[in-house]
Amino acid sequence: MHAATDVTGFGLLGHALEMAQGANVSLELDAAAPALLSPRVRELARLGILPAGMYRNRHFAQARVDAGDVPRDVQDLLFCPETSGGLLISVAAADADALLADLLADGRVPDARVVGRVGEAGAAGGARIALR
């Protein structure tokens, strides 16, 4: 394992950015991978029913996030603060399948999945996140 954090008040993107900054790397995240993006949750986000912390998190991290064509409601949800989020764990790509198998083996972990990959820091320097 290279790094791990609990996804709480800074949301997935805020915590991912902190991890990337600590290692001076870039991250590419699959915006559709997190399980929280159900149609009902997305509809609430489209209606603007979002916690105030989402706006603070977006302000903190948006300059380092390339959202590409990811819809605004999905972006907002990835910035949303969580009070009891999951874990974000970074491992070597070669170790990912074994970690997933171990986590899911006995049923105590209800969900685990690959949500992105680590790359070198951007040409402009510093950590960045690209959403795909």
Where are these regions (language model features)?
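Glycine-/charge-enriched secondary-structure boundary and capping motifs
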Residues: 1-132
